[in-house]
Regions:
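Positively charged n-region of N-terminal signal peptides that target proteins for export
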Residues: 1-4, 19
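Sec-dependent signal peptide hydrophobic core
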Residues: 5-10
Length: 167
């Protein structure tokens, strides 16, 4: 009898310890606070290509990326951005501007399995943007995206954006 009780307790303990590892989506879910923002690219002008950089000079309160996994298993995102940025271009100098935006949409992550980088995809207003996960720890997340903007007057502009979040 004691042997059967011991085996039952051991079986329950073994089953309890067999908890599956959280998925990349589950590990990313939560509220992240923006701590760093930078963009770089080249703008085509009538006098030629002009390299520019944009860096944050002031990150205001409530700059959050909220990645939620809802009870119905949908995954929603709300990204609030309110940053004072410094734009720098050779020959033009530097000037400040405000970057304010709220993105509402859906998201999913792709685990690269150690072969390719992990990725985060956000879809908002019918457009999907992919972010390479450069680094991801329990309390920090660094993302990079490369986006091409097509302007009817200036043509195609490509920008690289890197953002860092902390919990």
């Amino acid at each position: 009898m004691t042997k059967n009780i011991f085996l039952a307790v051991a079986a329950v303990a073994a089953l309890a310890s067999c908890k599956k590892d959280p998925t990349l989506d589950e590990r990313l879910a939560g509220t992240w606070n923006l701590s760093d923002l930078s963009l770089s690219g080249t703008v085509t002008t009538p006098i030629g290509a002009l390299p520019i950089t944009i860096t944050d000079s002031l990150i205001r309160a409530n700059n959050t990326l909220d990645l939620a996994i809802n009870e119905d298993e949908t995954q929603t995102v709300v990204w609030n951005m309110d940053v004072r940025a410094l734009i720098t271009a050779p020959g033009l100098g530097s000037f400040g501007t405000d970057i304010q935006d709220t993105i509402n949409g859906t998201w999913y992550a792709v685990d690269g399995g150690g072969v390719t980088p992990d990725s985060l995809y956000i879809t908002a207003d019918g457009e999907k943007t992919g972010y390479e996960i450069l680094s991801f720890f329990e309390t920090s997340l660094r993302l990079r995206s490369v986006e091409t903007i097509v302007d009817p007057d200036l043509g195609s502009q490509t920008f690289t954006q890197e953002v860092t979040f902390i919990k």
